[in-house]
Amino acid sequence: MSPRLQDSYDEFDRQRLVAEPAKSAGLPGTDTEHRSDFARDRARVLHCAALRRLADKTQVVGPRDGETPRTRLTHSLEVAQIGRGMAIGLGCDPDLVDLAGLAHDIGHPPYGHNGERALDEIIKGFGGFEGNAQNFRILTRLEPKVLDEHGRSAGLNLTRASLDAVAKYPWPRQEGRRKFGFYGDDMAAAQWVRHGAPAARPCLEAQVMDWADDVAYSVHDVEDGVISGRIDLRVLADADAAASLAHVGAQSFPTLTPDDLVAAAERLSQVPVVAAVGKFDGTLSASVALKTLTSELVGRFANAALTATRDVAGPGPLRRFDAELTVPSLVRAEVVLLKTLALQFIMSDHRHLQIQADQRNRIHEVALALWGQAPGSLDPQFAAEFAAAPDDGARLRVVIDQIASYTESRLERVHEARSPRPLD
């Protein structure tokens, strides 16, 4: 880390919940550590099993569909790269935002958001399921790395600033809020992370990661849709098609009006790299045009936020709660329009919806089977947690933790081998 960046974060930001001894396996006479605390944290996330499992978890289409599918892992790598570039522009620590991008979906269950929905249905009466809260649970509890003085897992034992950078929704489950970042039994760790922070306000690094996430999946989901033949970008220049798309978008993203989205379609249709894609036919020239489009749109959206934030916050390194990320409303509308393209032409397809229904049923049936045979049906780590759980709610949470940890391949193997017994 440069001296300027090192000085902009203090010991409070770099504190870990559990103090760790110096490394002991180095050769005599060698220096044991050249990295910053946040570089070490990034390495811990990069090397953890929970991140690797994202390679077999759905982004939009399944990880085994198509020749070069995007998975939750490839998406996370893309978010990390976009966020890192933005961090450099703002003066945030690049490793801090990079690790937030890597970890931002680390709690996603099999089948992505569809799997979230199924698990939430199962445990709704005991605190619900939310991928962001599961992120925090994995990083602070479930991923094995460090034990506290009582022998309990501290997860990866990341620094306070690193954990806060992953917290897009830094509050527990609340009435009227669909998203949340912490389960009830993880609140002690959450309160340690958020000590002294403005209530319900994500730090700047988390805001950068969140926008990088929006940019990555809006642009790349459209890229995948164009390659698959499901999305034709020429609809943006068709007034009737754009109006229909804007109506769908305004219903799904109610902070914007149809007029906002029609205007966004008109602007994007006039961007030369968008028009150059035309009718995608898979040729070399078409593929180059599409890749140019994705690269330039990522730059368009990321740089607009950087410039707008600097206009408000001024020069100098920005960190933690020094500033809010400012995203121009016109740019936000363009990103929402791209999300709507994927929603309309990929996610609303009747075949896709049927696949999703089958996936949710599969998760429900696996949960029933694991519950009926627990703790014998659980992995050793989860079996011990199940045996120590004080009540049915805590025991069901352990079962949900195990299912959320599954790759899609493993979930399907367990489903095929299941022998369910009814819940009591």
Curated annotation (Swiss-Prot):
Keyword Signal listed: no
Biological process (GO), any one: dGTP catabolic process
Name of this chain's protein: Deoxyguanosinetriphosphate triphosphohydrolase-like protein
Molecular functions per Gene Ontology: dGTPase activity
Matches recorded under PROSITE patterns: HD
Family label: Belongs to the dGTPase family. Type 2 subfamily.
Listed transmembrane segments: none
Native source organism of the sequence: Mycolicibacterium vanbaalenii (strain DSM 7251 / JCM 13017 / BCRC 16820 / KCTC 9966 / NRRL B-24157 / PYR-1) (Mycobacterium vanbaalenii)
Every HD domain range: 72-218
Domain of life from the UniProt record: Bacteria
Gene3D superfamilies, per the entry: Hypothetical protein af1432
Keyword field contains Hydrolase: yes
Record key words, sorted: Hydrolase
Pfam families documented for this protein: HD, HD_assoc
